[in-house]
Design a protein with these regions (language model features):
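Outer-membrane beta-barrel "beta-signal"
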Residues: 31, 36-39, 221-225, 251-264
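Membrane-embedded beta-strands of outer-membrane beta-barrel proteins
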Residues: 84-86, 113-115, 128, 145-147, ...
Length: 264
C-alpha cells in the first residue's frame, strides 16, 4: 500500500464532505454546486428543483456512482463510490439521508443525516445547513454545521462561498471555499454546468494535511430531463492539488460519475 493510500485512509475518519460529494455538495454535482438556482427553460419539465414557495411536500430519491470518493481534494477511499439519498422538501426546508458505500472495499461506508434551509434574498441564495456523519466501521459520529451563499449575477453566471466546520476532539475545525460558474441550457431539457472551486483547509482536513490551500476543482456536468419525474446527470471533475496537499504527494485526481434523481 503506497503513501497516498495510507494517508487517505487516515484522513477518512478525520474529514469527509461529495456528489456530489463534500458537505456542501448535496446539490447536483460533486463540486458543491448550489441546489436552489432556477433555470428559465423552454423544457416542459424544468430542470431545477421546485421553488421553495411551492406549498407542497416534495419527495425525491437519488442514486449515483462515482469513480472516486473525492473530498477537499483527496481521494478518501482509493476506490469507487455508490450512493443512495432519500430526500424530502417543504418550502425552504430540505432533509436528506445520504448513504455511501465503497464498491472496492467492503469495510468502507458512510451515513449522513442532513438538513438545509434555503432562502432567496434578491440575487442572493443563502443556505445554512447541518449534517451529522458516521463513517463505518467504528465512528461515533461527527457534527458539521455550514453556511453556503451564492450570488446570481444573471440567469447564467453565479459565484459564492462555502464555509463549513466539524466538531472533533473538542474543537471546531473549518474548511473555506469560494466558487464561480455558469449554467446554460444547450438544448430542450438539457443543461450544462461548469464550476471552478478553490478550497482552503483551516484544520478540517487533518492531522496529516496542514493549514493552507488544499485544492482547485474544475467540474463539468450535463443534466438531462428524461421524463417529468426523472433527471440524469453525467459529471466529470479534476481536482488540482495545491500547496498543503501537494506537499504530501496527494491530490491531482480525475474522476467521473452518474446521478439519477426521481421525484415522486
Amino acid at each position: 500500500m503506497n503513501m497516498k493510500t495510507n494517508t487517505a485512509t487516515q484522513l477518512l475518519l478525520a474529514a469527509c464532505a461529495g456528489v456530489l460529494s463534500c458537505p456542501g455538495a448535496w446539490g447536483s454535482t460533486t463540486v458543491c454546486q448550489d441546489q436552489s438556482y432556477y433555470l428559465k427553460t423552454a423544457c416542459p419539465h424544468p430542470l431545477s428543483l421546485a421553488g421553495p414557495t411551492a406549498d407542497r411536500v416534495y419527495l425525491r430519491f437519488q442514486t449515483g456512482w462515482a469513480s472516486k470518493y473525492e473530498c477537499e481534494g483527496l481521494d478518501l477511499w482509493d476506490g469507487s463510490l455508490c450512493m443512495f439519498v432519500p430526500e424530502i422538501q417543504y418550502k425552504e426546508w430540505v432533509g436528506k439521508i445520504w448513504y455511501g458505500v465503497s464498491t472496492d472495499h467492503r469495510n468502507h461506508a458512510e451515513l449522513k443525516y442532513r438538513l438545509d434551509y434555503i432562502k432567496e434574498l434578491g440575487n442572493w441564495t443563502v443556505m445554512p445547513w447541518y449534517e451529522h456523519s458516521f463513517v463505518f466501521p467504528g465512528d461515533k459520529g461527527i457534527p458539521r454545521p455550514g453556511l453556503k451563499t451564492t450570488y446570481h449575477f444573471s440567469d447564467r453566471w453565479f459565484g459564492g462561498t462555502d464555509l463549513y466546520w466539524q466538531y472533533n476532539n473538542h474543537t471546531f475545525r473549518g474548511y473555506y471555499a469560494v466558487f464561480a460558474g455558469l449554467h446554460e441550457e444547450i438544448a430542450d431539457c438539457v443543461r450544462v454546468d461548469a464550476v471552478v472551486r478553490y478550497g482552503y483547509n483551516g484544520g478540517y482536513v487533518g492531522p496529516v494535511v496542514h493549514h493552507g490551500s488544499n485544492a482547485l476543482d474544475y467540474n463539468l456536468s450535463f443534466t438531462f430531463r428524461a421524463t417529468s419525474r426523472l433527471t440524469v446527470e453525467l459529471f466529470t471533475n479534476y481536482s488540482q492539488a495545491l500547496t498543503v496537499v501537494k506537499q504530501r504527494d496527494l491530490g491531482d485526481d480525475f474522476y467521473y460519475g452518474i446521478n439519477l434523481k426521481y421525484t415522486f
